[in-house]
Amino acid sequence: AETEKLVLLTNQKEQELGSDVLYRLALSRLHEVRPWQVILERFQARRWDSRLTKEPWMEAPLLRIVAEKQSLTPAPGGFLDEETIWRELLTELLRLSEPRPSAKTLLRWSLSREGLVAWAQLPNDAKMGIGAHLVEHTGPCGPALVSALSAGRGEDLVSIGLVCDLLFSQAATHPELSSVVLKSTGRLESWIGIGTLGTEEGRAWATVSQEVLGELPPDRATQQLRRAEQLLSSFHADALSSLSDALPSSLEQRLTRLGEALGHLARAPKRTHLDAVLAALASSRAHRLWNHEPGRCERLLSACRVAQAVVSVESPLETPRLAELVNHYADTLAWLDRAREDLVEGDRNPVVAAGMTGLYSLAVTVRERHSQQFATALCDFCASGHEQEDVLGVESLLQRVVAPVAARSPVLFLVLDGMSVPVFLSLREDLARLGWIEAMANPVTWPRAAVAMIPTETEASRASLLSGRRMRGQAGTEKNRFAEHSGLRQVSQSGKPPILFHKADLPGESVGLHDEVRRAIEDPEQQVVGVVINAIDDHLSKGDQIAIPQTVDAIRPLGLLLATARAAHRALILTSDHGHIRERGLTLRRSQERPSRSRTATGPVSPDELLMEGPRVLSPQHKIIVPWSERVRYASEKCGYHGGATPQEAVVPVALLLQSEQ
């Protein structure tokens, strides 16, 4: 139709079209499209920054952008400025959202595959123009970053910066590595296509890479660190990896030095060797990956605690009074026993594993000296039969501990059968997280621990504890004697005698306490409630080398009891009838009797045994042979044992715990 108009587009000039073609065009001439005029119109601008027209490469991508985008933000005041144009270009071409990207922004962007693909697809003139803009805004390391990007190393920008940290920062204080640094820097410069990478540029790159690394989730950060290790190797700079506070290999190198230091100390427990251990530990803890494996980290810390302990307590006490030995165990040696258990699991680093093995053997040797001293003093205590004011026997615990507290507050008296002091130390931390804080009724006279009966077996020691007298017995006897205890009855209300619950009274896997137990704890007139929990002792009797329960959740139904006691505003007294030792390659000494760690007083007494006799020895004729060493057992292998005279078995914790708001 005559009203229709046809628009033809061409990239040819008028002189190339010929007069016959021009004759057919409107006004007989070629109408030139002015790109910047189109761009201005789309931004509703009347003027523009003159600097923009000096970048001819911009026209094509900007025309495409304004043609494809349905709406554009109008230029403020009708003036199209450089920032607006760069924001559109970088966002649409590279997925870079900032018009003036910093070095950190560029490194963050380089972690996106989409952005790097977009860069690779740009025409060369656009790469040069954008590259110049990036150099202008990315600081001292800008030229090197753009050079690496142009050389196709964009996905490695963060990892290269980690390498720069070693080349330009960490190695600066190690002149012996100067030759390695010089050659490796040359290889890096060639790889990223730059003539010279100066110290200032390298350090700036390193700083921003570390900042970006700190923002990444652990898995992505590890990828960058692994890649940095590969680059170090390709630049023949492996010798520098040990200087890094970030590379996985450098942590292993530091841990290897820690393992070597532990090994030296295990062979010769000297203060100088301990200093080396602590220095190696400090170096390891300074590494950014130190906390990435909490379980391993805790085992390494335990190894260093053991190292400190064996140096400080290598020799037994000069004055071997039982009261002092009991307190020394509860305050010091029990921490050593707790820490050395963590060494059994070892470590995947063979040098660390060897150091732990040697340290564990040394700890056992040191502990044996203390155990022999303790057992000798315990032997004298049992023989005398007299109660000592500064030594609390389990048979006196109700009278000297529970009754005084119950006179002032309703009490839940918990007996965790078989709980050693080291296990209690772990449990106490869990209790504190739940708001149960250890207190002392009287800081001067409150006992840190009590001494079990001999043999340190449930039938003797628990019955004596819950009866308030030296005797053997089962649950029925304990229940009756507990209710009849004169000291407890004196602080109880009429018609509400002390009440004791055993395993049969407690829930198994069911939810909630049995009604009788719950009602007793909730009853404000029931002054004393006792509960025996067998979870720990039950684990000891198993043949599998399973972990001893040491948390509230693992010791069922402790959590339910604590929650009920908290609601009833009861004070908590926590103790045990005896402790235990773990199965750690004990020597089996054949015996016709069933007990694991005691035998009748017949036959010769071995150097690692003691003949104990006296009123606190609850066996025929009040005589028995027990080992003072933790290396001997008389029965089949189990998870743990008790019955002997080591402090691990004979010293039990005594703790008064109050709610944090009390």
Residue ranges with predicted function:
Residues 1-411, 418-572, 576-662:
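…; additionally, a secondary subgroup of soluble metalloenzymes is captured
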